[in-house]
């Protein structure tokens, strides 16, 4: 079947959970949750680009320009490493790489 339905298993790091809990904007939280749900259910990730070390940045074009940094493993598991927004982008990318290095050890 060329259009085989693929579902991803989503894992979140403590760092991601902490970031998400601190998000004050309820609508931004809803957009982030919706985007994660879409990630889980389809192969097309939308507005997304690689940032190095096999880590990708998922862009949510809302308010501050939210970002979710994730790593796809085994073709079926997505690990949400950390979140942030446009203003902390470079710092978040470095942090995501650090978190991934710790996980894979």
Name what the model sees in each region:
Residues 22, 38, 71-72:
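Conserved catalytic core of Hanks-type protein kinase domains
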Residues 34-62:
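A short, surface-exposed loop/turn module that caps and links secondary-structure elements
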Residues 15-18, 24, 36:
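N-terminal interaction/assembly modules
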Residues 23-24, 88:
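Alpha-helical hairpin
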Residues 1-10, 18, 29, 44, ...:
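Enriched for short, Lys/Arg-rich terminal
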């Amino acid at each position: 079947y060329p259009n085989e339905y693929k579902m991803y298993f989503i894992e979140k790091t403590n760092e991601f959970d902490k970031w998400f809990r601190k998000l004050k904007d309820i609508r931004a939280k809803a957009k982030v949750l919706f985007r994660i749900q879409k990630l889980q259910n389809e192969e097309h990730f939308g507005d997304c680009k690689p940032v190095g070390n096999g880590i990708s940045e998922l862009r949510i074009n809302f308010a501050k320009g939210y970002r979710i940094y994730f790593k796809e493993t085994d073709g079926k598991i997505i690990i949400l490493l950390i979140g942030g927004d446009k203003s902390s982008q470079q710092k978040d990318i470095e942090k995501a790489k650090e978190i991934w290095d710790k996980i894979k050890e």
